[in-house]
Amino acid sequence: MIDPVNNFKIPEEWIARSGLPREELEKNVASGMIVILSDGSVLKRGYTTGTTASAAAKAAVLSLKKTVDSVSVPTPVGLRAYLEVSKSSPGRAVVKKIPNDHESDVTRGLEFVGEAREAEGISILGGKGIGIVKRDGLQVPKGKPAINPKPMEQIRAAVQEAVEELGLKGAEVTILIPEGERIGKETLNSRIGVEGGISVLGSTGFVEPWNDHLGEMRGDLIRCTDKVVLTTGRIGMKYSHMLFPDYTVVMVGSRISEGLDNASGDIIICGLPGLVLKWGNPKMLEGSGYATVVEMLEKAPEHERLKEAFEMAVEKGKGARIVVIDRDGSVLMDSKSGK
């Protein structure tokens, strides 16, 4: 069974642990709307702001000629997304961003409004509630509405479908988010140079049910600070905030190298040994007789490969401070102290 959003092959033991009928799982996994975890837990994905904006835009165009109560739009990963239209009138449609299991997603339930009129060709405009980019270096040019390139392509594709369905020459669509300015203050936008609303984002069209700093915004946040901690997960994030209170802490998961490419200034890499040390030496367990880095640490804390992997991480860090912690926040290795 393959998760079509991230192309991950789900292990059979994870599927068995879920306790759910296989047919039901296959259907939901194929839709892109659920994630199966290693313990068998099933979490619900949602749709990104890009997908929701696409639905509002397409529905607005369709409403020029007919009544619309639901809409289907393409996503960047090739799946179709299906959303209800909560309100519509000729040339105007409202779509709500559906809830998901991402507890920190402040945009859940937010209304996206599309306003459309017939035109020559297709044009997409950002209206009230979509932030404006105020600095250089982001994916969207300074002074433009904060609709990232991938969701802009998605919105245009959705509008193109509507235009072709109705036989129009084109359409001009304005996307508005009535509560966008208020919600934007609860996001990272002000820290990366986007003001006046939220950003329209989404590289896959789906929101993962955990906080990864909203995908592509992660790189923007790293680039906008000169004191950053790149951490590997929730535990690392919690203790990094405690260990390095003067730093901006960004969770990069296994994408440590990608985070480093975006970072400059004072950089710390902090996390659990399983990710940090294996990033240093991906082959550290080969032929060692140990199944995991944690097992090696517990059974052979002085193992030469632990030291070797740490030294390789320091070398790959190119001057970044490397800090390895355990699950209770104790520092196991620190390149600054030589520990």
From Swiss-Prot:
Protein's pathway: Cofactor biosynthesis; adenosylcobalamin biosynthesis; cob(II)yrinate a,c-diamide from sirohydrochlorin (anaerobic route): step 6/10
Reaction it catalyzes: Co-precorrin-5B + S-adenosyl-L-methionine = Co-precorrin-6A + S-adenosyl-L-homocysteine
Entry-linked InterPro entries: CbiD, CbiD_sf
Enzyme Commission number: 2.1.1.195
One function term, GO molecular function aspect: cobalt-precorrin-5B C1-methyltransferase activity
Coiled coil among keywords: no
Top-level EC class: transferase
GO biological process: anaerobic cobalamin biosynthetic process; methylation
Keywords recorded for this protein, A-Z: Cobalamin biosynthesis, Methyltransferase, S-adenosyl-L-methionine, Transferase
Top-level taxon: Archaea
Family in the record: Belongs to the CbiD family.
HAMAP family named in the record: CbiD (MF_00787)
Entry protein name: Cobalt-precorrin-5B C(1)-methyltransferase
Species assigned in the record: Methanosarcina acetivorans (strain ATCC 35395 / DSM 2834 / JCM 12185 / C2A)
Gene name for this UniProt entry: cbiD
